[in-house]
Structures are given as C-alpha cells and as structure tokens.
Amino acid sequence: MQRSQFIETCNAWAGAGRPFLFMIDYEMEQFLIFRPEEAARRGIFYNIKGRTNFAGAGGGAAQEVRDTAPPKFRFEAVPVAFPRYEKAFSLVKKHILHGNSFLLNLTFPTPVETDLGLEQIFHASAAPYRLLSGDRFVVFSPETFVTIGGNTIRSFPMKGTIDAALPDAERRLLENEKELWEHNTIVDLIRNDLSMVAADVRVARFRYIDRIRTHRGELLQVSSEIEGRLGDGWRSGLGELLLRMLPAGSISGAPKRKTVKIIAEAEGERRGFFTGIFGIFDGEAVESAVMIRYIERVGAGKDVGRDVGRDVGNAVGNTSGKQTIGKQAD
C-alpha cells in the first residue's frame, strides 16, 4: 500500500469509527492497514493488552499452543561480532563529536537458536504488545508508541535498563548520570514530537520504574509519561498524525532527521518492520507500540533476533558494545 493510500484509508476508517490494525515499517516504505478479521485471514494476529483478533485467545487453538509449549526451551542468541559493532560505533562517535547527533540507537541482527516456533513465542510472551505476522516475524514489545483516549495523546518513552537481580538495582539505575542524561534527552525529543500534533504538552510522570520479565530474568526499566491535547477532529486526520511523529524518537535519536541518516550509514542495512510501529484503533481510541524485541524468520529453521542498543557522546565503546550485545541476547 502506498503512503497516500494508507493515510486516506486510516483517516476514513478512524473518522467512521471502524476498528483496524495498522503496521508501518521503520523506513516508512511499507504501510499495512486491515480490519481485525481481515488481518486474521492473512495470518496476522495481535494481542495488545489482552485485546486480540486471535479466535482461540480464550481457549481453543491459543490454549493448545500454550499447553504444548515445553516448560524448558532453548533460546540462544549469537551477538554481533564486536569488531563489526566497534566499526559502526566509531562512525557514530565521529558524528557525535562533530555535533551531528547527541543520542543514537544502534542495532544489528543476531542469529537466534530456539526450539520454539514464532506462534509459540507469540502466545508464550507476557509482553503487553504482541504481533505475529504469519511465518515472517513475531514482536513481543514492552514499549508504547502512543495511546489516544478521548482527546488526550500520551507517550511513554523508555530509556534506562538494569538487571533487577543486581544489589540495590533501582537506586543504581536512577542515580546513574549517563542514564539520566539519556532519559532527559529522549523525554525532550518525544515532547517535541507530541508538540507537532498536540497542544498543552507536558511531562505527567518523570522516570518511573517498570518491571519487565524475560526468559533470562527480570529487568528494571525507566520510563516517563508525556501527554498532550488533540483537537476534536483528530480521528479524521489520524494517518497524518501518526506519520508526523515517525520514526519513533526512542529508537532513532536526536536530532531525529540527521540521526536517522547516520543510523543508515552505520548499520548498513534496512531495518524493515523492526523498530517500526503497529497498533489498533478500536473505534474510539488508539493503542500502539514500537516494534522492539523482534524475531524474524529468514529461512527454513533460521531466525534472526533484533533489539535496540544505545550510544551517546559520553559512552565508552567497550561498555556500550557489551550493553547492546547483552540486550540482544535477552
């Protein structure tokens, strides 16, 4: 679907109060929009905070998948080779030192070895935002893009993570100066993004802690809540509204336009739907997510996992590399 067709359809369906699922890739070249039942016929299923188009979500097929998933399973990621990461990081650091960017997310695909199928991962995950696109990819994301309820738009940027099992983990995370600097930067960026589409933008909550479960254990994640006020006719302009804020600031960086160009140069390949967005309009409100924690099927029995890392001007190459490699393996 072309960009203009997506905008036209999104505006028309939202304006008429017709529920739909939407998906937009990171590069804003692939635009998908389906009624929930049509998405299901195409093998595209979502579960967004318990709302789903999977027919067996209350039992039946979905329950069968949960029941047959092994209590112990293999899930191993092979992190990107550090020399490759270091080369990209050096390029990013050069741009940061030249003032072209001051916050940039850098990510690479990593092979995943698992005895779980994509559909099993979809059902087994406890993430609030889940998406299964046939045998192409699965997303189990903790990160909201935007929510819209009434005339209020909200975003919840996530920046700052630590292993919850570490001693005094919460204090260490909240008092880390580097984490604070990054979080301040992304909050400012998201506030600016919301200001392009909303009035009276404000930070409603600053740096609160969420707990995220992974198969390796629990993580502490720092988020903030930013909100603004939309005009009464926002549904009839939902397509333009979404696209004006893309790509998501939390997975690109600041300043956004220049940083996106640096990402393309450093990573050397397209992200596709990874770090794009997906969401639902339920006839009145919007719930959407950033497509992080993403596994893609690239061949028979071959999966590639992707998750985000981060680099800033005061980061040390070795530390940031280990952090990104660790996040990709979770």
Which residues does each PLM region occupy?
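Extended alpha-helical targeting/anchoring segments
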Residues: 1-330
